[in-house]
Amino acid sequence: MSHLAELVASAKAAINEASDVAALDNVRVEYLGKKGHLTLQMTTLRELPPEERPAAGAVINEAKEQVQQALNARKADLEGAALNARLAAETIDVSLPGRRIENGGLHPVTRTIDRIESFFGELGFTVATGPEIEDDYHNFDALNIPGHHPARADHDTFWFDATRLLRTQTSGVQIRTMENQQPPIRIIAPGRVYRNDYDQTHTPMFHQMEGLIVDKNISFTNLKGTLHDFLNNFFEEDLQVRFRPSYFPFTEPSAEVDVMGKNGKWLEVLGCGMVHPNVLRNVGIDPEVYSGFAFGMGMERLTMLRYGVTDLRAFFENDLRFLKQFK
């Protein structure tokens, strides 16, 4: 009891010297723990007469309360200082430039499709779509390719069963459009098509764009003029273009279209022709009254020519080093 004031003073001095919450807790244990200096003072009460014990106990409790208040105050100071230090370390300099948000980019094939749709949209063409799981009638028969026709063997078709398949061309969209719409018709049909082939210039899935006009007095001259303007627009230069006689079951006459490359060699870019009368009859359009032309082109092929890509498979490998070149 005689040393009580000294213990309180010693405790307060130790509290003020504590540099962090952990050191402060050590002081608390030293003075107020089960075996702490002030706690042990309570054991001296047994040495006093009974009538003096309550007053002495009150003095000890008052001393313990002083130390506890000092502990609480110091703890609040230390926690406040720690919080301020952490906030200072985490201060954001609002004058610094913000983090740049990376912009995505369109896939080069998508760029090609959008560019072609934009050009033909200005000529009054609308975009038509159709199912990728097709029946053999719309994919072959209606296009003047009956079951015995050798052209079927050239398509490397993915069949589900005897009549259902993954479409090998977007021409089926033309058939479905003509079945449901009377001339005049002016459409383009972009979409995915599938053939069982894979090498440097072929993939099992690729993109095609087909175009179709059906109206009165449509001629091959109209076809040539339309495609010539399109190619000059797409490649952004005045190209030397040639139409080479070819064969497609669904057009007559038919032609392959080539452009002169920078290396002085002809490059094949698309196929075209006048819609075969049998195709018009198959959809209930009188070929004596109406005529039309159609064309088809591979989107990957045109993209390769436009950007100088040599391996078709690069479009499908999702290599960001390749794709970022087109942002």
UniProtKB/Swiss-Prot annotation:
<dbReference type="GO" id="GO:0004826">
    <property type="term" value="F:phenylalanine-tRNA ligase activity"/>
</dbReference>
<dbReference type="GO" id="GO:0005737">
    <property type="term" value="C:cytoplasm"/>
</dbReference>
<dbReference type="Pfam" id="PF02912">
    <property type="entry name" value="Phe_tRNA-synt_N"/>
</dbReference>
<dbReference type="InterPro" id="IPR006195">
    <property type="entry name" value="aa-tRNA-synth_II"/>
</dbReference>
<dbReference type="InterPro" id="IPR010978">
    <property type="entry name" value="tRNA-bd_arm"/>
</dbReference>
<dbReference type="InterPro" id="IPR045864">
    <property type="entry name" value="aa-tRNA-synth_II/BPL/LPL"/>
</dbReference>
<dbReference type="InterPro" id="IPR022911">
    <property type="entry name" value="Phe_tRNA_ligase_alpha1_bac"/>
</dbReference>
<keyword id="KW-0030">Aminoacyl-tRNA synthetase</keyword>
<keyword id="KW-0067">ATP-binding</keyword>
<comment type="subunit">
    <text>Tetramer of two alpha and two beta subunits.</text>
</comment>
<feature type="binding site">
    <location>
        <position position="252"/>
    </location>
    <ligand>
        <name>Mg(2+)</name>
    </ligand>
</feature>
<dbReference type="GO" id="GO:0000287">
    <property type="term" value="F:magnesium ion binding"/>
</dbReference>
<dbReference type="GO" id="GO:0006432">
    <property type="term" value="P:phenylalanyl-tRNA aminoacylation"/>
</dbReference>
<dbReference type="GO" id="GO:0005524">
    <property type="term" value="F:ATP binding"/>
</dbReference>
<dbReference type="InterPro" id="IPR002319">
    <property type="entry name" value="Phenylalanyl-tRNA_Synthase"/>
</dbReference>
<keyword id="KW-0547">Nucleotide-binding</keyword>
<keyword id="KW-0963">Cytoplasm</keyword>
<keyword id="KW-0460">Magnesium</keyword>
<dbReference type="Pfam" id="PF01409">
    <property type="entry name" value="tRNA-synt_2d"/>
</dbReference>
<dbReference type="GO" id="GO:0000049">
    <property type="term" value="F:tRNA binding"/>
</dbReference>
<dbReference type="InterPro" id="IPR004188">
    <property type="entry name" value="Phe-tRNA_ligase_II_N"/>
</dbReference>
<dbReference type="InterPro" id="IPR004529">
    <property type="entry name" value="Phe-tRNA-synth_IIc_asu"/>
</dbReference>
<keyword id="KW-0436">Ligase</keyword>
<keyword id="KW-0479">Metal-binding</keyword>
<protein>
    <recommendedName>
        <fullName>Phenylalanine--tRNA ligase alpha subunit</fullName>
        <ecNumber>6.1.1.20</ecNumber>
    </recommendedName>
</protein>
<comment type="similarity">
    <text>Belongs to the class-II aminoacyl-tRNA synthetase family. Phe-tRNA synthetase alpha subunit type 1 subfamily.</text>
</comment>
<keyword id="KW-0648">Protein biosynthesis</keyword>
